[in-house]
Regions:
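Active-site-adjacent beta-strand/loop module that shapes the phosphate/pyrophosphate-binding cleft
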Residues: 29, 76-77, 83-118, 127-130, ...
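Short histidine/acidic/glycine/proline-rich micro-motifs that form metal-
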Residues: 55-56, 118-120
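Acidic, metal-coordinating catalytic segment for phosphate/diphosphate chemistry
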Residues: 1-24
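A generic fold-level signal
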Residues: 2, 20, 28, 43, ...
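Surface loops and adjacent helix of pleckstrin homology
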Residues: 38, 107, 124
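Conserved beta-strand and immediately adjacent loop positions that scaffold enzyme active sites
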Residues: 24, 32, 110
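Conserved Nudix-box catalytic region and its N-terminal flanking loop in Nudix hydrolases
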Residues: 28-67, 71
């Protein structure tokens, strides 16, 4: 995000305690499928997204990631979280799908469970890179 932009769904860009660090997570089922969320933003309409988001200043990556996933999916991550890699201000992690039902927030309109060979076309290449490192 550019310095002048504001997130429509949180206080990012309006609240000085928010950072520009973003964490995303590849959450996989025992069957090898992963969760993708359909974004509901003007900037990325109908794009598929990995769960995650902005990490607040003073918040650990893991705590921020757990908070973002709970906000976006209603899932409480109880399994260990492993770092895949970081590039620029974005970090990618992975974990196993916890028990529970997915409940979407206002940030997303839909979700799918998809295998690597069934990836949709409208997903960022950087997300696909992270997914390929896990699956």
């Amino acid at each position: 995000m550019l310095d002048s932009e504001e997130c429509q769904h949180c206080d990012y860009g309006r609240d000085p305690v928010d950072s520009k660090v973003v964490c995303k997570i590849v959450i996989t089922s025992d069957e090898g499928a992963l969760i993708l969320l359909r974004a509901d933003t003007e900037k990325f309409p109908n794009r598929w997204d990995l769960p995650g988001g902005h990490i607040h200043i003073g918040e650990s990556m893991e705590k921020g990631l757990r908070r973002e996933v709970l906000e976006e999916t209603g899932l409480e991550l109880t399994n260990p979280i492993f770092k895949i890699y970081s590039i620029d201000r974005e970090s990618y992690y992975t974990t196993k799908l916890p028990d529970g039902e997915i409940t979407l927030s206002h940030e997303h309109t839909d979700f799918i469970m998809v295998r690597r060979d069934g990836m949709p076309d409208n997903i960022s290449k950087k997300f696909v890179r992270a997914i390929k490192k896990v699956l």
